[in-house]
Amino acid sequence: TGGGNLFYSFNAGMGNNMIGLYAYYLASPLNLLILFFNDIQIFVLVLTILKLALAASASAFFMRNRFSSIDNIWIIVLATCYGMMSYSISQKCNLMWLDALIMLPLICLGIYRLIMQNKKTFLFISVLVMVVCNWYMAYMCCLFSVVYFFFELFCTDEKKKYIVTIVKYGLTMLLAVMSSMVLFLPTAMNLLQGKGIESTTDYTPGFHIGIKTLIKGLLPGIRMQKAFGTESQGIMLFCGTFVLICAAAYFLSKRSLKEKILSALVLSFLVVSATFIPLENVWNGFRKANSYYCR
């Protein structure tokens, strides 16, 4: 509007490059739905509900294809828990971040299909869409994809194919990111000229929260305490009592010991990543999180 367009706007101070703002806040195709709304508040409400519903649907699609033996009723319950977990609710004010909740299960499914079926297209498209929708959360999704890839890989017994599969995964991820360069490259250049070059990151070993706060994050009814201009306190881990029961039952079951050990290692690494300051900063793009930590 006025003197602004997708690439540059004179409505921002003395003028500013808009590509970085667009790539971070507005690139999600779901934002086009605003064309059907006259009231911005109603649009934000509908968009929030839609994104949470799509996140639940994506997780259901993942579980249906990854764990074919699970009954549909349990998939619906678990998918609802995913879509309505405390992280989703606490981060609904960061609407642009919710796209990651939609795409992450699809990226995981793409990894599974790459390893088990040698199909690379689904992973390629999922990563490409995520980078285009929100490059910042795509970075975290790509980091998690590395963790999940090695989990799925080591759960298989085909050790002779490990190297080949790793190469295929790496090339697929690289091609997906490179394919998004039409938007990602100017965004990266814009960041390097401004906010991206500032750094107050602290890599001093230490934990952001204690064990008491960590346990609280697994319980219902815990809110993220956040005041404007301050760091958030607490960690949002709760995704339903049913999920906690299922997790306990899984580790007590007769499933493969190797799989349970790998699962425990992944969970432990993710918990440490959310609490250990140096690792937390790595997940945040090698920067200290501003206000909302444990993203």
Regions found by a protein language model. Give the residues of each.
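Periplasmic/ER-lumenal interhelical loops and adjacent helix-loop junctions
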Residues: 1-7, 29, 165-263, 269, ...
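Membrane-interface coil-to-helix junctions
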Residues: 1-59, 80-101, 191-196, 203-231, ...
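Juxtamembrane loop-transmembrane helix junctions in multi-pass integral membrane proteins
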Residues: 38-42, 69-70, 94, 132, ...
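Alpha-helical transmembrane segments of polytopic membrane proteins
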Residues: 48, 97-100, 141, 232-240, ...
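Membrane-embedded helix bundles of polyisoprenyl
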Residues: 53-65, 72-154, 168-188, 193
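Short alpha-helical transmembrane interface motifs in multi-pass membrane proteins
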Residues: 40-44, 168, 266
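Transmembrane helix-loop junctions at the membrane interface of multipass transporters and ion channels
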Residues: 129-131, 284-291
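Membrane-interfacial, low-structure loops and terminal tails that flank and connect transmembrane helices
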Residues: 158-165
